[in-house]
Amino acid sequence: MFSKQEAQQLKKEFWTAFGKSFPRKWILYDTKIKDFSFKFSADNKKAEVSLDIEMKDELFRNAYYEKIWSLEDMLKDYVGEFSKDEFYTLENGKIISRIWVEKSGVSIFNKNTWQEIFEFFVEKMDGFERFYFDFEEWL
């Protein structure tokens, strides 16, 4: 177990190592669609790459979610199997729509799994970005 400070330091080292290992400018928040972003996340049990649709207006959020969902088979071609939740609740209680891919059995606190996480991040985020670029006009 790590102290809070040790955990923060390891997280900082993890993200720095990822950036140095795979120096690339990702789309992330620069989608040109407000509150529509791609995210990386990792904790002590898993790593995730997600598409978060965070519009406050539920009608807009649901409309974007439905557009993505209508392209489900195409998205699978880009990222493989994925999970989805139209009403995903964040830790802060905010409701968003999320589509994500997950890799379990890895930990941000285990340096031996970092390379595996980095490769997962690159493969899946690249798939999400290619999907976005190919269908951007339709979204």
Question: Language-model segments: which ranges?
Answer:
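Charged, terminal alpha-helix-loop-beta segments
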Residues: M1-L139
